[in-house]
Regions:
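Hydrophobic membrane-insertion alpha-helices, especially the h-region
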Residues: 1-7
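N-terminal low-complexity, Pro/Thr-rich disordered segments
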Residues: 7, 11-57
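Acidic, Ser/Thr/Pro
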Residues: 16-17, 42-231
Length: 231
């Protein structure tokens, strides 16, 4: 597992150190045999059981609404998938435990479908989501592990998205990015210790940018079709 602040995503690796066959099969020393009956070696200790992932939380409604989250969900980092079928504003803003409104996670007009992060910044707490809409909407909170996986060289998508880079980037890696749209095109990369903005443009755009070493997650904010290709 890898952590960005409070953000935890799977990277396809574990923290266990595998022993070589020579080490596993080597005969024990006499002193080791004498103590083995009385002591439990670290390798014999059971591995801690990982905490189960929370199940998805799905909410739906029409027009304005305040969704109060379970208290146990307030500080978790979530992948939030949203839809809206309306003609006017669709704005989703987190509220803290005192009801204070935070920066919106979605601010669009008309029909919308996309995925964004919630509580990715360390210390963030969300007690509720304030929905401003004129049509039907859905909001689904899911564990980060349910995000799309970027496993090959190329990746395509449309609109807002969150993508796990698997395996994480290593060494000098560049990304050729393209966007066909009329509004924002913002791309951020997350490593175990930092977040870096890769692209911040408006409208159609194409270019090549470096992907930070150790990138485990990429977020995209876009209104059109986009594509990435690593090299």
């Amino acid at each position: 597992m890898a952590v960005v602040g409070t953000l935890t995503v799977p990277t396809g690796t574990t923290n266990k150190v595998a022993q070589s066959s020579e080490t596993r099969n080597a005969p024990a020393k006499a002193t080791d045999r004498a103590s083995s009956d009385e002591e439990t070696t670290p390798s014999d200790e059971p591995s801690p059981t990982p905490s189960p992932e929370p199940s998805p939380r799905r909410y739906s409604g029409v027009s304005a609404k305040v969704i109060k989250l379970r208290k146990s969900d307030w500080t978790d980092v979530w992948l939030v998938t949203l839809t809206h079928r309306g003609q006017s504003n669709f704005i989703v803003s987190p509220l803290d435990a005192r009801g204070a409104e935070q920066s919106s996670i979605v601010n669009e007009i008309g029909i919308y479908k996309g995925s964004v992060l919630l509580n990715e910044d360390e210390g963030t707490e969300t007690a509720a989501l304030k929905i401003d809409a004129d049509g039907k909407w859905t909001v689904t909170l899911k564990p980060i592990s349910k995000a799309r996986q970027w496993t090959g060289a190329g990746l395509t998508g449309r609109g807002d998205d969150v993508v796990i880079v698997n395996p994480p980037s290593a060494g000098l890696t560049t990304v050729n990015a393209r966007h066909s749209g009329s509004s924002n095109f913002i791309v951020d990369a997350y490593t175990e210790s930092s977040r870096e903005n890769l692209v911040n443009e408006i409208g159609s755009w194409r270019g090549e940018v470096p992907l930070p070493d150790g990138t485990i997650l990429v977020t995209v904010h876009a209104d059109g079709v986009w594509s990435f290709k690593k090299s």
